Amino acid sequence: MTHRLSLRRLALCLALITAGLTAGAQAANEQYFPLQSYRVGPYAAGGSGFFGGFIDYLQYINANGGVNGVKLTWSECETEYVVEKGVECYERLKGGLNGAPAAATNPLSVGIAYATLERSTADKLPLITINHGRTDSTDGSVFPYVFPLQLNPYSEVSAIINYIGQREGGADKLKGKKIAVLYHGSPYGKETNGVLQTLAKNAGFELTLLEVPHPGNEQQSQWLNIRRLKPDWVILRGWGVMNPVALKSAQKVGYPADHIIGNIWSNSEEDVVPAGAAAKGFISITTHPSGTDFPVLQGIAQSVVNAGKGNLADPKRFGTVYYNLGVVNGILNVEALRLAQEKYGQKPLTGEQVRWGFEHLNLDDARLQALGAKGLVQPLKLSCADHEGGGAVRFQQWDGQRWNLISDWVQADRALLRPIIEASAAGYAKEKGITPRDCSQEQ
C-alpha cells in the first residue's frame, strides 16, 4: 500500500511538473497587452468601440499565426476613465500575464497617461497615446517611452486653423475672424489652450475659450455666450456626452452646424446620432475614415466577427470611427512588435525592446498596402526626435446618415509647433533632472 501511494505521488508530481512546463512553454511564446479599458460611464462609447477594435485586430493576428509565431494575449481592467482607477490598473497589469511580458500600455485617456507617464518610463514600458496625450512627448529625446502616435493635440488644432483658413480663402483671411473654442474641462480639453492663443496671435484672429465642465451635460450658458459673440467658427473639443449636447445646444441658439468643427474626439457616429437633425452638416477632423471597405477590416470580419468572436456588444458598430481607430492602434502596436522582433529575435520581447520598434516605425504606402490598411492608416515615420510621425488630418461632414470626406490631407504647421514642443520638453527635462538623449547617436 505504501509503495502504491509513493508511485501515485510520484506520478502526480510528474504530471504537475509537466503541466507547469507546458504552461511555461506556452507563456514563453506569448506577448501580453495590458488593457486599461473603459466600457461603463459617460465615455463608454469611445472606450468600448476603441478597445473592441483593438482586441479584434489582436484576434485577427492570432488567427493568422501571431507575430512570427508569437501569439498575442491580453486582459482588461476597467478604469471608467477615472485617473485613480487607471493607475491601479496600470500597477496591476504591468508585470505581464502568466509569464508573457507586457509590450505596451494604451490607456486612451489623457489623465491616465499623465498619471502613469513617469511610472511607465521607470518600468521601461511604452505608453501609447494615439491622437492624444501630452504634446511635448513628441520629443522622444526627453520622453523615450511615450508615443503620441499620428496626431498630437497641437497638430490637431493647428490643422483645424489651417482648414478654416482654406475655407475663408487663404491664411491671410483669418485676420479679424472670430473663433470660439468649446473645450472639455479636463487635462485633455485644456491641453491646447496655450497653443491656440499663439496661433491666434500669429494669424490675427479673435479667440474665445469656453470651458464645459465634465462630463458636459450642461452647456446652456456657453451657447448663450456664443450667440452673443457671433463667432465665424466654433471648434468643438469635446468628449463623450458633451458632443451631442453641444450640437443640440447650437441648434437651440441658432448656430449653424456646418460652422462647427469637431476635433479628434468629436468625430464619431456616437457623437452625432444622438443629436439627430441637429448634427446634419457638422464637420469634424479624422485621421482615419469609417467604413469596412479595407482588406484588413474584411479579414477581421471573416476570421473574427463572422466566427462569433467579435468583441463588440453591438455588431452594427463594426467599421465605425471608434472601432476603426482601435484597429489602427492595433496595427501600430503589432507593427512595432514585428519590427522589434527583426532586431531582437522572433520571441516575446520586453517593453524596452518593443520601444525600439515604435521609435523606428516606418509605414509607407507599400507596407500599408501589404497590411490591407492603405487609406485607413496615414503613412507614418517615427524617430528619436519625432514620436508623432504624422500630423495630418482630413475633414469629414455628417449628412444625417454617414460621414463623408470633404478634404484632402491637411497638414499641421509643424515648423511653427516644433520650437514650442522642444521648449516645453526642455522645461520638463530641467524640472525632472533628465538628460535628453542625443538623437544623432540613436540607431
Region roles according to the model:
Residues 11-20:
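Bacterial N-terminal signal peptides
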Residues 93-108, 126-130, 178-183, 209, ...:
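Periplasmic-binding protein-like
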Residues 250-330, 410-413, 424, 436-438:
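Extracellular/periplasmic periplasmic-binding protein-like sensory domains
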Residues 30-32, 45-55, 59, 64-140, ...:
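Beta-alpha junction/loop-to-helix N-cap segments that form part of ligand/metal-binding clefts
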Residues 2-12:
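Bacterial N-terminal signal peptides that target proteins for export
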